[in-house]
Amino acid sequence: MLRRQFHSGCVQLARTRYTKPKPKNTETRAKEQIRLPTQQTHHSNELRIQPPIPPSTKNIVVPDDHPLWQFFSDKKFMRRPEDLDTTSRAWSIPELRRKSFEDLHSLWYTCLKERNILARENHLLKNAAKNNRNDYEDISEKIRTTMWRIRHVLSERDWAFKRARETFAQNKELQDNLVDDFKKEFLELDSSEDEQAFEMLTRFQEALFGIHEVIEDNVVDRKFVDGLKLVATLKLQRFQSRNDSINAILEESDGQINDVGEAFVVFTADNNLKAVEEACDAIKELRQGENGVSRFDELPTVRGYLKRLVSATTV
């Protein structure tokens, strides 16, 4: 009976690292002209060991505008407790209510900077000086009281704004009165005050219609589209008396812009006479080609306009 076995010849045919034995070097020749080691070949005599430089603050130069100076008071390592203002008090809520948003913003960051300075000094006092005095912590607590009161006042204003906006959205008569009052004030400003007038218009369009200067932040709805038409109309009326072309555009449309495509052209134009005049030339071409936008297509059309505008600005 035959048995299946591995062939024994594979071991003999296996390839080793060297297919041929390496020849032995029988002739070892002695090297001639051997250079003896010298001092020049190992190191240079020009190197000298210098004494170590002791660490000192004189060797470190810090520019005066370095950001970390904000954690120091008058560039002092640490103020003495006698130098601290221990007689001051925290701001009261009635006092903060009389301040503007800019004042509250500045006061908040002033308090934040002072608390950072006090926190560093208190850390040095407790860890480096091994002192348990609470002078720095007491002043920091006063400042913290001012900061939470600032947040309280801002929260009051935010809730008041939200409630006023809800009430305003439900009262059509109140909206019309506000628009009429703003329109009168906006158009009565002198031509030398164009910059101030358009700053007013920017705040007005954001507060009433949610139209933001940042394109990506806008939500296109019916209120947005109606606001777009009103803002374009006010923009043209601002320059109506200064240019015949602008006046003709308004007269053709009964004194206001009703097409959202025309409104978008005026809205995206710069706030100056030349840019608005060029926008009116574009409106003439739209009217000649009868390229109007129906009311049913206004929302998707404006969304497409904004999407293309965002793509153009990001390129």
Swiss-Prot record:
GO terms for cellular component: mitochondrial large ribosomal subunit. It is found in: Mitochondrion. Keywords: Mitochondrion, Ribonucleoprotein, Ribosomal protein, Transit peptide. GO terms for biological process: mitochondrial translation. GO terms for molecular function: structural constituent of ribosome. Component of the mitochondrial large ribosomal subunit. Mature mitochondrial ribosomes consist of a small (37S) and a large (54S) subunit. The 37S subunit contains at least 33 different proteins and 1 molecule of RNA (15S). The 54S subunit contains at least 45 different proteins and 1 molecule of RNA (21S). Belongs to the universal ribosomal protein uL29 family. This is Large ribosomal subunit protein uL29m. It comes from Candida glabrata (strain ATCC 2001 / BCRC 20586 / JCM 3761 / NBRC 0622 / NRRL Y-65 / CBS 138). The gene is MRPL4.
